[in-house]
Amino acid sequence: MPPANRILTLSIVEGRYAIAKFPCDAEIPAWAAGATFFSVTRTREELSVVTAEASVPAKLDASRGWRMFKVHGPFSFDETGVVAALANPLARVRVGIFVISTFDTDYLLVQHDEIPVAVETLEHAGHKILQLELLNS
């Protein structure tokens, strides 16, 4: 079992991202899969696509301006507290997050204008942030 005060290493991922919503029966848009990073989730209620903001057509209603942290993994499926170790300090300073989990790790998205506060808060909580040179990209 991991410690309650888990310390994690994260990297800032270059670029800005957007989150688009489609009807649940929509086809996955071809433009989404062209980016280096993209995530698609289909539920009974919707199809959500997260991809590079530049890939999303301007006329499409989407939440734009997200920046991304990659949490250095991998993590086993029975590890607990990874997301909580990041979400809890950010919630205390009212920074909203969007989390994507993969087989090996997690990605944490925050709005571009909140990334300085997110970095400061996560570092204050003891986490290590790499690629700070991308902070203003």
Could you describe each region identified by the protein language model?
Residues 93-108, 114, 132-137:
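A cross-kingdom feature marking solvent-exposed beta-strand/loop segments within repeated
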Residues 1-93, 117-137:
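Regulatory modules associated with amino-acid/nitrogen control
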Residues 46-51, 105-111:
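A generic structural motif
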